């Protein structure tokens, strides 16, 4: 079923010839009204020109009207030309939409170190037809993903729709993929930015597929106010629900993955320590490999936990896998075959109780398979 964007938003895409596959690869997301926006970008020191330009626009505090995305070319590590090409992409999109370039955010994803084919973008932008539906945009921004990622929620009459891409080179560092959330709620920019930081910390920053943080990743929230005011607490609960659903979709669609891993840590000294511990477990290559092999090797969970920096006493920790207690201050008797069968599910939950306080947090990951190696051996990054 088609997902309708919030009031005042339109989107569309085309095949510009950037992806060798010939699939859709150039997309626009547009607000008919100036929108307040909140933005989180990769902290990778080799960040792409689109990220540097986005940070400058964000610092200006001016409203945003549109996003132009190319998928297939990261426009990263392309020297001064890359910065000029990124500016040109914004100018071309602004010309197409009748806006100023300062109202247009750029985003690029794909192969690093290859000049951006601006001439293809120039030819492709006029071909994009804008509609009030999300699917064309969601499809066009994909690279090694196997499926589009769209989530939605409604809060007191206002709508929130999220679109994301991400499959590999996913690891927490401020933002971990391309994610675009749009809403017709009216939210003051200062409140929007503060709330978005908290949402990103709890959702997108808790996803890890392979431990690599991309050079191009961002998470964006636009609010154009077309519906009007809504209760802020309920609004951000809705935003977090959409972001969490997208984060889970990204982890489940990890390159070569066969299952989603959800790690829940409770009883931590602080919420931050709980999130850190959960991320460490979700990102452990040894545990991810055991997950793929349906091996309930709790020692790998404990080892990852010990490297997380979270405070705990190994003699008090409790580890539960798919509802089966494996460890509680020492070895517990359990049926390994039963635990292995439970790990064959499409979603596997690890629950860890540190018994240090009230802090709780989640992280999302996936298993590590031969297909991950194959995909990344064949795909130029």
Swiss-Prot record:
Q: Which family does it belong to?
A: Belongs to the ArgJ family.
**Which InterPro entries does the record match to this protein?**
Arg_biosynth_ArgJ, ArgJ-like_dom_sf, ArgJ_beta_C
UniProt-listed Enzyme Commission number(s)? 2.3.1.35, 2.3.1.1
Indicate which residues the UniProt annotation says bind substrate.
143, 165, 176, 255, 376, 381
Q: Which domain of life is it from?
A: Bacteria
Which GO biological process annotations does it have?
A: L-arginine biosynthetic process; ornithine biosynthetic process
Is Cytoplasm among this UniProt entry's keywords?
A: yes
Q: What does this protein do?
A: Catalyzes two activities which are involved in the cyclic version of arginine biosynthesis: the synthesis of N-acetylglutamate from glutamate and acetyl-CoA as the acetyl donor, and of ornithine by transacetylation between N(2)-acetylornithine and glutamate.
- Catalyzed reactions per annotation: N(2)-acetyl-L-ornithine + L-glutamate = N-acetyl-L-glutamate + L-ornithine; L-glutamate + acetyl-CoA = N-acetyl-L-glutamate + CoA + H(+)
Q: What is the lineage of its organism?
A: Bacteria, Thermotogati, Deinococcota, Deinococci, Thermales
What PANTHER family does this protein's entry cite? Answer: ARGININE BIOSYNTHESIS BIFUNCTIONAL PROTEIN ARGJ, ARGININE BIOSYNTHESIS BIFUNCTIONAL PROTEIN ARGJ, MITOCHONDRIAL
Compartments reported by the entry: Cytoplasm
Question: By its UniProt entry, which HAMAP family does this protein fall under?
Answer: ArgJ
Q: Where is this site: Cleavage?
A: 175-176
GO MF annotation terms: glutamate N-acetyltransferase activity; L-glutamate N-acetyltransferase activity
Q: Name one Pfam family in it.
A: ArgJ
Mainly localized where? cytoplasm
The entry's keywords: Acyltransferase, Amino-acid biosynthesis, Arginine biosynthesis, Autocatalytic cleavage, Cytoplasm, Multifunctional enzyme, Transferase
Q: How does it assemble?
A: Heterotetramer of two alpha and two beta chains.
Write the protein's name: Arginine biosynthesis bifunctional protein ArgJ
Q: Where is this site: Involved in the stabilization of negative charge on the oxyanion by the formation of the oxyanion hole?
A: 109-110
Q: In which pathway does it act?
A: Amino-acid biosynthesis; L-arginine biosynthesis; L-ornithine and N-acetyl-L-glutamate from L-glutamate and N(2)-acetyl-L-ornithine (cyclic): step 1/1; Amino-acid biosynthesis; L-arginine biosynthesis; N(2)-acetyl-L-ornithine from L-glutamate: step 1/4
Q: Which GO terms describe its cellular component?
A: cytoplasm
Active-site feature positions: 176
């Amino acid at each position: 079923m088609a997902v309708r964007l919030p009031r005042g938003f339109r989107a569309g895409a085309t095949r510009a010839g950037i992806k060798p596959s010939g699939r859709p690869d150039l997309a626009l997301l547009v607000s008919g009204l100036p929108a307040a926006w909140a933005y989180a970008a990769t902290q990778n020191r080799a960040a792409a020109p689109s990220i540097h330009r986005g940070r400058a626009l964000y610092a200006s505090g001016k409203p945003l009207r549109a996003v132009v995305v190319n998928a297939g070319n990261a426009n990263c590590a392309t020297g001064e030309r890359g910065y000029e090409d990124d500016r040109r992409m914004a100018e071309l999109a602004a010309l197409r939409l009748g806006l100023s370039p300062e109202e247009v955010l750029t985003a690029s994803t794909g192969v690093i170190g290859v000049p951006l084919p601006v001439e293809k973008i120039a030819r492709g932008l006029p071909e994009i037809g804008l509609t009030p539906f999300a699917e064309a945009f969601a499809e066009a921004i994909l690279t090694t993903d196997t499926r589009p990622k769209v989530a939605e929620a409604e809060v007191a009459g206002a709508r929130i729709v999220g679109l994301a891409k991400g499959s590999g080179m996913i690891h927490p560092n401020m933002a971990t993929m391309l994610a675009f959330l749009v809403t017709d709620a009216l939210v003051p920019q200062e409140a929007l930015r503060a709330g978005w930081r908290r949402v990103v910390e709890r959702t997108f920053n808790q996803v890890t597929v392979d431990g690599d943080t991309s050079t191009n990743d961002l998470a964006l929230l636009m609010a154009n106010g077309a519906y009007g005011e809504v209760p802020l607490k309920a609004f951000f609960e809705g935003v977090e629900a959409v972001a969490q659903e997208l984060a889970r979709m990204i982890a489940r669609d990890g390159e070569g993955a066969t299952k989603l891993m959800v790690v829940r840590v409770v009883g931590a000294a602080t919420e931050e320590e709980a999130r850190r511990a959960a991320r460490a477990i979700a990102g452990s290559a040894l545990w991810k490999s055991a997950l793929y092999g349906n091996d309930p090797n709790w020692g790998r969970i404990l080892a990852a936990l010990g490297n997380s920096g979270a405070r705990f006493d190994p003699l008090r920790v409790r580890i539960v896998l798919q509802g089966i207690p494996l460890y509680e201050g020492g070895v517990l008797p359990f049926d390994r075959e039963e635990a292995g069968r439970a790990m064959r599910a499409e979603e596997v939950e690890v629950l860890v109780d540190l018994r240090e306080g009230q802090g709780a947090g989640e992280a999302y990951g996936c298993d590590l398979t031969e297909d991950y190696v194959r995909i990344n051996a064949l795909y130029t990054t």
